[in-house]
């Protein structure tokens, strides 16, 4: 049986691991290192360099060297080299191909199967892009696994049978995740996860670069940001300085011949950076890790004191300020020192590959979806079908209905996020279900099913229960999330919770009022068109019609309290209408049956009180 590898496809560095005799082994690359820089360069002679060789020539080949491409996964980003455009998936595939070659050289056999990790907070488009990168690299991607989950799997499997709660704090080169997991008796279950897809070691490096640029400009008057080669040298020096400050109180940044002055005289950069200053200029970055931590503890429904172990993942967790913050957040709990933060994710991925291949027995991995999923319904409301932190794989269905009479089709718009208003979330994709037979609004029943597979990739189906017609979409389009979108998604939901609540309440009230107006109007019309004349007194019908007119006027405005008031009045008058027809029927016949009150309709027990917006979003 072909071997399967576990791959940690990182922003700055990547690692590949494989099971040997049931134990995971990290594979050294052809340069002899256990980590491979996620850097790709296109040499001018046509050669494609990957890893350390690409990183080594970056200064002299700035425009043709790509780093940190993981931050562009799931977006429409591309780079043009020699007239050809390369997507983020293609660049990532180059890194995966090198890892694949190195693993094949180590094992002496071909590798086709792999488990690849992604940040827990990656959205659907980003996960799909990662899978595509694997396919481009010639790999059969068995599973996409969340990085903190893989780390917990590597850490927790040999910790005995007692159930334990583990916090994984994962700060890598470009992404940040925090997850709470329970491990016991071979089961690894994710309780909650949160994070920031645009926070990582690169951001700390950038602060040092900016600090050096400002210092140099202050002494020489020259702005180094206009010199690409100088900036590449600064980036490399900043990374080294950051690493040195993890073990020393100060570091020197000495870059001779960094640029020349107006007289073509060479200039040197020589600065001393102390740890305290480094921590001062990066404090706000560190503070951005607090909210996801607090969110995870809250979502998991536990107290900090219930956390048994803290596992640090990612090279950026070596910074003393990060370690100190984690200790502060966990009430003084010392992080576990028994795992290599650079390698533990790949080790966990290899173990999961072993589980899928049957090499590792009696292990069950239960992961979660990091963000809620739903569709847009009438009023622009986000109707969630799957809540965040739901264990995957999972499948949920809800039945919706049409917004207009004789509506021939419905537009299903799929969103991911936590906001109450759909447009404030991430649009993953949309599709149309056509061929709905003519019928009054509220009669057709459209069943929408969300299916998330074990990779966290979403499939959505819409089916007309009446005709059996259905349409399915595998969410794979989408532009990915911008820097602002992803880290604001949950934070905005909390910051704007009150605003969202009011808008949702307004949408709900409008929907209820419109439905009542429609049903009452229809009932009055039927009474007036009765063959033998209506048994309801004319003044009662006129009174109800006046109430309908008032409700319509209120719906034309923006005063939600006026709509509520008009709806209450119409409801009372409608009840009087029902009472009048009941009394008239009783008087006419002793054997009388029950007549439908306004609003009566066929049983819709399974129908959610929301309506799918057709095509264009209705203006509010």
Swiss-Prot record:
Name this protein carries in UniProt: Chaperone protein DnaK
Region (Disordered): 588-620
Species per Swiss-Prot/TrEMBL record: Mycobacterium leprae (strain TN)
Induction: By stress conditions e.g. heat shock.
Signal peptide (from-to): none
Family: Belongs to the heat shock protein 70 family.
CDD domains: ASKHA_NBD_HSP70_DnaK-like
GO function term, MF aspect, one: unfolded protein binding
The entry's keywords: ATP-binding, Chaperone, Nucleotide-binding, Phosphoprotein, Stress response
Cysteine pairings via disulfide bonds: none
